[in-house]
């Protein structure tokens, strides 16, 4: 891995214009502090406050993307960095766009035999009663291209599907109805070509939503996950396959649910996960013997163009 002085002047991209701006500011600050404590010449850069071409004008030679959601992990900022010729962390343009789109992610996974919940793409002309009958109740309704479970609803009655669609449609024109899988929430963090130890998530209610992720102090995280060694090995292998199938690289996270029979259902891939000291990827890295500072340097060392 390159030494801290080999990275040149590093821009930590944070903030942005998505609904996840505040979370991104937290991630960016944690990354910035870790890089600086390791001797890297790192500085904050908020694309919502400066034009991207300012990166060249200010002499940046590498970018660590700590943006979340729209414009930050959907291929937009990655495309800008490609045009500028500045190496950046995480996945490229196409993989970022695909991973942000849960519907197309599922289509690719299904084509490769990766298990994912049954789903239907909704619009205002959909027969919502038929959707409830086909997927069963309860079911999940969510924007296809939004993060942090923003706009997500758990629907328990057929009469609630329309309202859930309206809520999700406020965030994205593409809305997904998905079979609800009852079971254990797990996440597999990816670093380079390795899947790190699984993290098990236990929420107070029955849904790992925005409240449970960022506001509740009752959500618990377990690493080791408590899953059998054999099953953990299999899930980590499948998660790495799911990540690669989308063309993802560098680092990321794949979320899944293990149903009561022990079958994993893969939900989505995240190409720019949270990076505060208490986020899931740092938690998995710590279990693998990698400190937060080491993790941030490893991610930066995987930066690329093209």
Curated annotation (Swiss-Prot):
Iron among the record's keywords?
Answer: no
Role this protein plays: Cell wall formation.
Gene Ontology terms, MF aspect: ATP binding; D-alanine-D-alanine ligase activity; metal ion binding
User: Entry cofactor note text?
Assistant: Binds 2 magnesium or manganese ions per subunit.
Domain ATP-grasp: start-end pairs: 106-301
Decide whether keyword Iron is in the record: no
Q: What is its EC number?
A: 6.3.2.4
**Residues given in the record as Mg(2+) 2 binding sites:** 268, 270
Gene3D superfamilies, alphabetized: 3.40.50.20, ATP-grasp fold, A domain, ATP-grasp fold, B domain
User: Which pathway features in its UniProt record?
Assistant: Cell wall biogenesis; peptidoglycan biosynthesis
Identify the SUPFAM superfamilies for this entry. Glutathione synthetase ATP-binding domain-like (SSF56059), PreATP-grasp domain (SSF52440)
> Which Pfam families does the protein's record reference?
Dala_Dala_lig_C (PF07478), Dala_Dala_lig_N (PF01820)
Q: Which UniProt keywords apply?
A: ATP-binding, Cell shape, Cell wall biogenesis/degradation, Cytoplasm, Ligase, Magnesium, Manganese, Metal-binding, Nucleotide-binding, Peptidoglycan synthesis
Q: Where's it found, cell-wise?
A: Cytoplasm
Q: What class of enzyme is it?
A: ligase
Q: What protein name is recorded for this chain?
A: D-alanine--D-alanine ligase
Q: Which reaction does it catalyse?
A: 2 D-alanine + ATP = D-alanyl-D-alanine + ADP + phosphate + H(+)
Source species of the chain: Nitrosospira multiformis (strain ATCC 25196 / NCIMB 11849 / C 71)
For the ligand (Mg(2+) 1), the binding residues are 255, 268
What cofactor is this protein dependent on? Mg(2+); Mn(2+)
Any single GO BP term: peptidoglycan biosynthetic process
